[in-house]
Amino acid sequence: MKPFLRSQLERYAQRLQELDFLLSREDIMADMQQYRSISREHAEVTQVAGRYARYQQREADLAGAREMLEDPDMAEMAQEEIHAAETELVQLEDELQRLLLPKDPDDERNAFIEIRAGTGGDESALFAGDLARMYTRYAATVGWKVEVMSANESEIGGYKEVVLRIEGQSGTGPSGSGVYGALKFESGGHRVQRVPATETQGRIHTSACTVAVMPEPDEHQAITLNPADLRIDTFRASGAGGQHINKTDSAVRVVHLPTGIVAECQDGRSQHSNKAKALQVLQARIQEKERSERAAKEAALRKGLIGSGDRSDRIRTYNFPQGRLTDHRINLTLYKLLAIMEGDLGEVLQALQHAREAELLAELGLE
């Protein structure tokens, strides 16, 4: 193990003692926000300290087994122990490196997924619907809840734009992340190549959608919106909606005047419900704009493999005639497209997580 990594790990046992003391203090227990924050850190530090203790134990086992080699009667057993200890030490070092990687505090949050039809007209809208279905089905496989926040449906099916809210427990995504941590690398341009249902000559068409994944702000993160900065319009809902459709001005559009960012919702039955949902999405979009601007500045200094998540970055191609999905950022190609479109997205998300971890390890000089 590199000395730098070992020196980092040595600090965790001491930090664990400090956190144990803090969690026993009455003033900390009385402040629920601070108590939750310290408890979260305590869980992370406990995990690292525990794995490092195991690493040190296996180092001691290895040293003992090497001494046993000098005894002819014990040599065979010692050789087996040496092999087992060396194998586990390699695995533990890799695990510890990943546990020390900088964490994005937003990874544990719920997320909004915004899917917009792009080039390709009706076919693009149909593909936007396919993507929404793919994410919804994946969410179901890992026990997440999906709520449609707003939807602008196309006349022939699919969506011109749809916003989903996905809620789930932390630790259920790849590498133990939450919803946002699992899905954040889905942001960007998604291209589809297939024969549209309306194509009579059997020609393959190319169309595209853009996806933006935004963390849902919690009550402590949420920005305060000045009512003077908002323009709120009501209008009659359109599209699927049952008997109430077009009878009341229940749909709501909110414009944030300083930024020009817009959010609307017409899925709920009441104006109050639609306004609340629109404001939720608006807050997430404003924060995502600030986040994207920061990411763009960082990307100008260092162009990462995964990219900045900008909508203009073409990240993936879905080729239906070949049954192929290609993620261009990490040169991943899978020939199981139909299964992926049915929600079998885990392998793709895991590969992106591992690529990002490898990037971070390289930056820290650990690989």
From Swiss-Prot:
Gene Ontology CC terms: cytoplasm
Subcellular location: Cytoplasm
Post-translational modification: Methylated by PrmC. Methylation increases the termination efficiency of RF1.
Stored InterPro entries: PCRF, Pep_chain_release_fac_I, Pep_chain_release_fac_I_sf, Prokaryotic/Mito_RF, RF-1
GO molecular function, one term: translation release factor activity, codon specific
Residues bearing the modification N5-methylglutamine: 243
Keywords: Cytoplasm, Methylation, Protein biosynthesis
Similarity field: Belongs to the prokaryotic/mitochondrial release factor family.
Protein role: Peptide chain release factor 1 directs the termination of translation in response to the peptide chain termination codons UAG and UAA.
Protein name from the UniProt record: Peptide chain release factor 1
Organism: Acidovorax sp. (strain JS42)
